[in-house]
Design a protein with these regions (language model features):
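N-terminal segment of the mature folded domain
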Residues: 18-163, 223-228, 239-247
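Flexible, solvent-exposed loop/hinge segments that line or gate ligand/substrate-binding clefts
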Residues: 100, 203-362
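C-terminal motif of bacterial Sec signal peptides marking the signal peptidase cleavage site
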Residues: 10-14
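Sec-dependent N-terminal signal peptides
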Residues: 1-6
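Extracytoplasmic ligand-binding site segments that recognize negatively charged/polar headgroups
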Residues: 126-130, 136-226
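Sec-exported extracytoplasmic/periplasmic mature domains
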Residues: 57-69, 87-91, 99, 131-135, ...
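Second-shell loop/turn segments in exported
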Residues: 42-49, 71-74, 116-117, 131-137, ...
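Residues that flank catalytic or metal-binding motifs in active/ligand-binding sites
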Residues: 123-125, 174, 187, 234, ...
């Protein structure tokens, strides 16, 4: 399996002055649109999250159509590696399923010539709980059950807790095989943040991009998790919905405010609409509890926000102009195809704050 995937789209023709004045306002776009020029350098470099890989490919294609000759070379090495490469100045921005952590904020500011780096949520997605349990087409789990499965306190599928959640299913006595991301992955942090928020009485193992459960087997990248689940009877793992759909995998329902909730575009959208920010300003870190603990009916709570980590200031003009162009197009035109790719389009209240932050990049 390749260690990195380069996503490059777009022809190499120049971008004329007409394109420099166009606005990123596609037919049917809602909310603030911002202004996207086509100035700046032709190629941006970025690295990080596998969760946003397919979204970046879509955004890249749309940017190349909107601004011919523009492209992003994006390498999917994982959120942790992406943040490290950004801080080291090796890429123009990072893709990460988690914002910068406390001990990265200072080094990131140094990389940005003494200016703060911003976490900009450009993509929302969902975490699919893929499993290998023949004869059980509609598995239901709860946050409490998940916490106990991924910490080794529920070890067989016919455990009374799981049986009570699945009264119509004949769960086997198969041993449960948890599969987690072995590489530093933002989706692991999202999963553990969800368990901490939704099942605090059952998950005390902690959070972070490294799996803390202490049980199961690790696999690298979403494709590795899917391969491991497929190859292991009784396995359960977590991947982004788009990867699960591409692989044709079954995924579990999660109990919510109105009972068992399947993972669909609508149920994920209901959770994302509850998104709130931790603070004012342009560093747009989300309060994940607003989604993980939502009381909205028919809301699938295990969602993720994946960020683009950028310098607020400190780029050269060529890089700054290109980043603003790419992000503005992605936040507008690029949202149209996200549902088909397994993502959730930006809610208007998030998009409004995002456009303001993008416009403020210098």
């Amino acid at each position: 399996m390749a260690v990195a995937v380069a996503v490059v789209v777009g022809s190499l023709t120049g971008c004329g002055s007409d394109e420099n004045r166009r606005r990123a306002s596609p037919p049917g776009a809602s909310g603030p649109t911002g202004t996207a020029g086509c100035g700046g350098k032709s190629e941006l470099t970025a690295e990080g999250s596998a969760a946003q890989q397919n979204a970046i490919a879509l955004f890249n294609q749309v940017w190349g159509q909107y601004c011919p000759g523009k492209r992003v070379s994006y390498h999917t090495t994982g959120s942790g590696a992406g943040r490290q490469q950004f801080i080291a100045g090796h890429v123009d921005f990072a893709g990460s399923d988690s914002p910068l952590v406390a001990d990265q904020i200072g080094p990131a500011a140094e990389r940005c010539e003494g200016n703060p780096a911003w976490d900009l949520p450009l993509v929302f997605g969902t975490v699919a709980l893929v499993y290998n349990l023949p004869g059980v087409p509609a598995l239901v789990v709860s946050a409490d059950a998940l916490a106990k499965v991924f910490s080794g306190r529920i070890t067989v599928w016919n455990d009374p807790i799981l049986a009570a959640l699945n009264p119509g299913e004949n769960l086997p006595d198969t041993k449960i095989a948890p599969i987690y991301r072995a590489d530093s992955a933002g989706i692991t942090d999202d999963m553990q943040q969800y368990l901490t928020a939704a099942a605090p009485q059952s998950w005390a193992e902690g959070v972070g991009t490294e799996f803390q459960g202490g049980v199961g087997a690790g696999a690298v990248k979403p494709t590795g998790v899917i391969q491991a689940v497929r190859a292991t009877p009784g396995a359960i793992g977590y991947v982004e919905k788009g990867f699960a759909d591409q692989a044709g995998m079954s995924y579990a329902q999660i109990t919510g405010a109105s009972g068992a909730v399947p993972l669909t575009d609508d149920t994920a959208g209901n959770a994302v609409k509850a998104a709130a920010f931790l603070a004012d300003g342009n560093d747009l870190v989300l309060d994940l509890n607003s989604m993980y603990k939502t009381e909205k009916p028919d809301a699938y709570p295990l969602v993720l926000a994946t960020y683009e980590i950028v310098c607020s200031k400190g780029y050269d003009a060529e890089t700054s102009d290109a980043i603003k162009s790419f992000l503005t197009v992605a936040a507008n035109n690029g949202q149209a195809g996200l549902s088909a790719a397994g993502y959730v389009p930006l809610p208007d209240k998030v998009k409004e704050r995002l456009i303001t932050a993008i416009d403020a990049i210098q």
